[in-house]
């Protein structure tokens, strides 16, 4: 019988930052990247510190692996039209913040951007997309390759290995038909359940650690409240309270304030900051 498990976004916020639970993230990454990944630490920055004022629909975490690569996980629940731009900004910020001013450019670390989205982002029939950087000749259409000195310098064989690597998992586009271990993980991300036949790395640990029935009473109440807030926000996006111009969102916030809606809920629903909403009073 399939157990009801905790949503992955909540798990990242509350559970998977603990070292004893790294095995779950390591399993997911190993299946996605098709290589053995070991996480050595979770890094804190202004973007991923615990903050109750943050938008409910976005969760992120920054990790560092045994190869000193940076891995940023981001889970986006509701629609965001400029999401691709935010992915680019996030990766650029990690690179600039983590490189010492006196460091050589060759010391720039590899960054993996893992994006789990629960909305229909762009046109495409697949549910897992990978983005890399390569250079092709405008006249000969040949692919630029590293020479032997560069391979030794970077310790990479291909140019694309130097640049950030992007993954987008469109969870809601998955048809629940599992064909490999990565599909088993996506099934879990979509349904919060693990089938007895699944064998993907990290899923058995996820089944054990993320069992809803094993949550303490206070923790369960907070989790249920989180789910309620997500459902409320989703309903707001589906209605006229969705993404719009800043003037429209300000007007919506004013109306919600008049009707006694809590400021944090207004912030989550409109994308406005707490300070912007307080200024409307």
Model-flagged regions — what are they?
Residues 10-14, 168-171, 184-188:
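Short, hydrophobic/amphipathic alpha-helical patches that form generic packing surfaces
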Residues 1-165, 175:
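Accessory alpha/beta interaction modules
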Residues 2, 66, 71-76, 173, ...:
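Short, charged alpha-helical interaction segments and adjacent helix-coil junctions
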